[in-house]
Structures are given as structure tokens and as C-alpha cells.
Design a protein with these regions (language model features):
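Generic domain-boundary/flexible-linker signal
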Residues: 21-23, 52, 64
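Short strand-loop junctions, especially beta-strand C-caps/beta-turns
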Residues: 13-17, 58, 63-65
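Amphipathic, hydrophobic secondary-structure cores in small proteins
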Residues: 40-52
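Local sequence-structure signature of Cys/Sec-based thiol-disulfide redox active-site neighborhoods
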Residues: 2-35
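A broad structural signal for alpha-helix termini and local helix breaks/kinks
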Residues: 35-36, 83
């Protein structure tokens, strides 16, 4: 592993009352394929229709910002971009 690359805490915030959990788990499954780039992964159930993915506290994907659920590939691309600089 290249130690110059950043390791990330990934936080997936999802609306538990809106049944967003299946999408959160699908994103989690894909994110875990990059486990050597991760320092921590957090699933955070919230309310209010929220579905967000944050990398080290910075919003990288959002259902409300993107007018729909971010795809797993979109999330992985955002993580790769954040990692590389």
C-alpha cells in the first residue's frame, strides 16, 4: 500500500424511518472493498429523509444534493478523488 495516500473515515448517514438501510448497506459493501484505504466506517441511522456519505467529515455524496440516491460507483469515484488529492 502506498503510505502517501490518505486513509479515510467513511460515515454513511441514512434515514432509518424511510427504509434507506438497504441502499446504505449496498454502499457499505462496495466501500469495504477498499478496506486498506479506510481508518473507520460508520453507519449512522438518522431521520428526515437523509442519505449522505462523508469522508473525514466532508460531504462527498448526498441524496438531496444530487436529487436522488448516489450510486455506489459515484461514491467510490468521490472517495478515489478525495484520496488522490
Amino acid at each position: 500500500m502506498n503510505m502517501d495516500l490518505k486513509r479515510f473515515q467513511i460515515r454513511i448517514r441514512y434515514c432509518a424511518t424511510c427504509n434507506h438501510e438497504p441502499h446504505a448497506l449496498a454502499v457499505l459493501e462496495r466501500v469495504l472493498k477498499y478496506k486498506m484505504a479506510l481508518s473507520e466506517v460508520i453507519l449512522e441511522p438518522v431521520e428526515g429523509g437523509v442519505f449522505e456519505v462523508l469522508a473525514n467529515g466532508k460531504l462527498i455524496a448526498s441524496r438531496t444534493e444530487e436529487s436522488g440516491f448516489p450510486g455506489t460507483e459515484e461514491v467510490l469515484t468521490a472517495i478515489r478523488k478525495a484520496r488522490s488529492g
